[in-house]
């Protein structure tokens, strides 16, 4: 990404934001560490200088393979939020994360994790669950705790653009397998004497604490809540995974260029307007049909597009697993008292909380 593009991002995206709504800049898509740490140090400084206002927040999602002293210094200096892509034990991780020479990357990733731990830099792990992962809840839990990793989020393997199909779509018992995995992982969290932070548990905890009339925020269906900038300055919004996908009807989801302006340049795009209208129809359909709408907010446009081939559809496998089954499974665990007397802080609860959440979503219906 050129300095010209960085300056345009600062001028057209960052500077217009009110001081109390400074954006989080997420460096993602591909592997951000293919560029040297020195490049990011200059880029961060340029964005600060050109964008004005309070300090920006930055986040990296990385495979951690290249972590060294330079990266440690960068992330510590700029207080960067670090996410590491790590799929559990070596055999699971290496089955889909390989080096350019075709070798497994697990050992290299763990070397990076060790360096982060030695430096005292906090990080979280994102683990992609494949069909092969679903029977391995204990192995995955034991691996993470054995490595001193206690902050994990699960993504399910998705159908995304030209990346190929998800192994979960080819598994007829995927719902049962995912439910079984999550139940066992929740059990392990509950009986562990040390706290284990799992996004899926804490997400439901947040729903239980929310006001009864408050629908879950879904930034992916609201235009411009997320703005994605490609390496050449192409602008997109909605789901970040959309940019670059082949979609002639939507100009491959490139709705403008940051060098030509910010949000307004996207508003002027016919392709953006078509996508926005179609996504809105999909959200309305979800609201009309789905008893989980209050806790989902209309699904992820990228998953609808890649699974269904359209934005105005409703349920996807991604939604069924990560929203519906996750909610039901965690609420079942709460109702069963799985987290009573647990080390998981904040899950000592009035039993009416989970029952009330079922009433709000209709998820008590079977």
What are these regions (language model features)?
Residues 1-4:
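Canonical Radical SAM [4Fe-4S] cluster-binding loop centered on the CxxxCxxC motif
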Residues 6-26, 35-159, 166-171:
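Radical SAM/AdoMet-radical enzyme domain recognition
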Residues 8-28, 313-360:
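Short Fe-S-cluster ligation motifs
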Residues 95, 99-107, 114-235, 242-258:
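Radical SAM enzyme [4Fe-4S]-AdoMet core and its adjacent flexible, acidic
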Residues 201-320:
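Accessory C-terminal segments flanking Radical SAM cores
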Residues 362-365:
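Acidic, carboxylate-rich catalytic segments that either coordinate divalent cations
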């Amino acid at each position: 990404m050129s300095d010209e593009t960085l300056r345009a991002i600062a001028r057209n995206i960052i500077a217009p934001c009110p001081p109390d709504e400074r954006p989080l800049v997420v460096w993602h898509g591909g592997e951000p560490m293919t560029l040297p740490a020195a490049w990011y140090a200059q880029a961060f400084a340029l964005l600060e200088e050109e964008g004005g206002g309070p300090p920006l927040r930055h986040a990296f999602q990385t495979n951690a393979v290249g972590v060294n002293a330079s990266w440690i210094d960068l992330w510590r200096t700029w207080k960067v939020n670090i996410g590491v892509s790590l799929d559990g034990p070596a055999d699971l991780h290496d089955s889909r994360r390989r080096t350019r020479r075709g070798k497994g990357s697990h050992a290299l990733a763990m070397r990076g994790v060790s360096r982060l731990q030695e430096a005292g830099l906090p990080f979280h792990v994102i683990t992609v669950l494949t069909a092969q992962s679903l029977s391995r809840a204990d192995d995955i839990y034991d691996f993470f705790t054995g490595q001193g990793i206690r902050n994990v989020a699960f993504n399910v393997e998705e159908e995304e653009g030209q990346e190929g199909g998800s192994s979960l779509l080819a598994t007829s018992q995927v719902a049962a397998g995912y439910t079984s995995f999550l139940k066992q992982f929740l059990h392990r969290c509950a009986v562990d004497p040390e706290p284990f932070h799992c996004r899926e548990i804490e997400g439901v905890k947040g729903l239980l604490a929310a006001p009864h009339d408050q629908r879950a925020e879904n930034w992916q269906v609201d235009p411009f809540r997320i703005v994605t900038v490609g390496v050449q300055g192409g602008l997109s919004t909605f789901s970040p995974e959309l940019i670059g996908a082949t979609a002639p009807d939507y100009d491959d989801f490139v709705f403008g260029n940051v060098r030509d302006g910010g949000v307004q340049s996207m508003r002027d795009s016919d392709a953006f307007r078509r996508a926005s209208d179609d996504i809105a129809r999909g959200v309305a359909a979800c609201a009309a049909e789905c008893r989980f709408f209050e806790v989902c907010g209309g699904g992820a446009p990228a998953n609808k597009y890649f699974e269904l081939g359209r934005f105005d559809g409703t349920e996807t496998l991604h939604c069924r697993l990560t929203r519906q089954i996750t909610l039901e499974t965690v609420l079942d665990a709460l109702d069963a008292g799985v987290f009573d007397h647990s080390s998981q802080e904040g899950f000592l609860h009035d039993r009416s909380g989970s029952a009330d959440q079922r009433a709000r979503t209709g998820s008590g219906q079977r």
